[in-house]
Amino acid sequence: MRDQSHYGSKTLDEICAALVERATEFGVEIFDFQSNHEGALIDFIQAQTAGADGIIINPGALTHYGLSLMDALIDAKLPVVEVHLSDIHSREEFRQKSVIEPMARKQISGHGWQGYIEALDLLVEELK
């Protein structure tokens, strides 16, 4: 179980359900995927790029050192929004650097699960 003081109490399934509900309001479809393994994330991005219009990603600890993940996101040539449940900029120093942020359209950090909704709203607006 993740530390609720940093990450809130909503489960990943609940967050995904909220995203699907919001996506339905916009008439768009989302595909969700979770892995603790960088290679699996890269494989998913590479496999889904052709059918996608944008990427919302919470890279977790890969935020700080996931250069292969960053390269896959760059190679996808899609707009990317980086999301973090906690405010990584107010946490330990090692958590404050993101290798993903420079290539992302935006980083949303510290808005809890609602950050995912904000990311979807941003992508839908940008892709209109």
Where do the PLM segments sit?
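Glycine-rich phosphate/diphosphate-binding loop of Rossmann-like nucleotide-binding domains
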Residues: M1-F26
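Short, glycine-/small-residue-rich phosphate/pyrophosphate-handling segment
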Residues: E29-D32, V81, S90-K128
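Structural motif
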Residues: F33-Q46
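Short Gly/Thr/Asp-enriched flexible loops that form oxyanion-binding sites at enzyme active sites
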Residues: A47, G66-A76
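Short acidic/histidine-rich motifs immediately flanking catalytic phosphotransfer sites
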Residues: Q48-I55
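Short glycine-rich anion-binding loops that position phosphate/pyrophosphate groups of nucleotides
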Residues: G60-T63, S86-I88
